[in-house]
Amino acid sequence: MTRLRANLLLVATAIIWGTTFVVQQAWLGTLGPIAFTAARFLLGALVVLPLALRQLRSVSRTIRPLQWNDWLLLLVTGCVLFTAALLQQVGILHTQVTNAGFLTALYVPLVPLIGLILLQHQVHWSTWPAALASLGGTYLLSGADALILGTGDLWVIASALFWAIHVLLVAYLAVRTHAPLVVAAAQFLTCGLLGLLASLLFEGPTPADFASAFHGILYAGILSVGIGFTLQVVGQRFTHPADAAIILSSETLFAAMAGFLFLGERLLQQQLIGAGLILAGTLGVQLVPLLFPPSPSPLSLSEPPRAIRAASSASQNSCRK
């Protein structure tokens, strides 16, 4: 798959995620947010599982079977996904939606920053201005009010860190395992089961609650999780995680468009400017590297840093003994 096609898959993911905000607002019913998260990820896992099992058998025959450390990383990725979603939801309960939307977008510059410092990822120079454009656009689109940090905001900032880690883990595992559908199904199942346990402990949902959100669960489970998150994993196998973060941030833009089309919401001038900045960042990270190709680098996404390669090799050798 070409980098352009991979990026288009990520744009499709952002469109699906953006429209899901409208669905959650209209069809959440009386179901608690943690239970809703659990239901949609478990449904998403069921959607992807048959294809994932088929891909797992194929990869085991043609490339290599997944080792115990692969499964451990998949489990960690699911835990990170659940933690990010939970921290974000807790933060939203104690802050304004405007603050939450902007602070969540902090994961956009965090992805290339963490990748550069900890994983030695080399990024094209255009990534940094594109990330700042997306972050600034999100701020304007969310209202550009004075941002006074409270307890809820700190929870959302923590969730942004975990969203950034999740993007990096997905990028690494999609290449490492050669099985993006397995990566998707494993993280969905882990996140869904953790969410189910948390909802039983803290929310106590009833069958009537699940029934009230039936249509929302169907849409979010099949489209947002089953298709959207899976497209993310497939797309990230062929593009840089920093580029993926910027493209996925256009979710905010598509959420605003969906609100305009389906809920009659109107955008102010500053919000339109913000939407333009997000669009510019999304297009820039795709087009600028084509006009100004990067110089060859000894490190690539498909070749992790030396320390990770050495640890992985030693672990796999120990499994063969």
Please name every model-derived segment.
Residues W27, F36, R40, G91, ...:
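Hydrophobic/aromatic residues within transmembrane alpha-helices
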Residues V48, L75, V123-G143, A160-W163, ...:
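Hydrophobic transmembrane alpha-helices of multi-pass small-molecule transport proteins
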Residues R5-A14, S60-L87, P129, T151-S159, ...:
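Loop-to-transmembrane-helix transition segments
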Residues M1-A38, C79, L87, D145-V175, ...:
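Glycine-/small-residue-enriched transmembrane alpha-helix faces in small-molecule transporters
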Residues G29-T83, L110-I114, F162-L169, A184-F202, ...:
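Transmembrane alpha-helices of multi-pass small-molecule transport proteins
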Residues F41, L49-R57, A213-H215, S249-K321:
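C-terminal-most transmembrane helix of multi-pass membrane proteins
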Residues I16, T20-F21, L49-N99, L103-T104, ...:
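Specific transmembrane alpha-helical segments of multi-pass solute transporters/efflux pumps
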Residues T37-A39, A100-Y107, V170-G192, V225-L261:
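Helix-helix packing/entry segments at the starts of transmembrane helices
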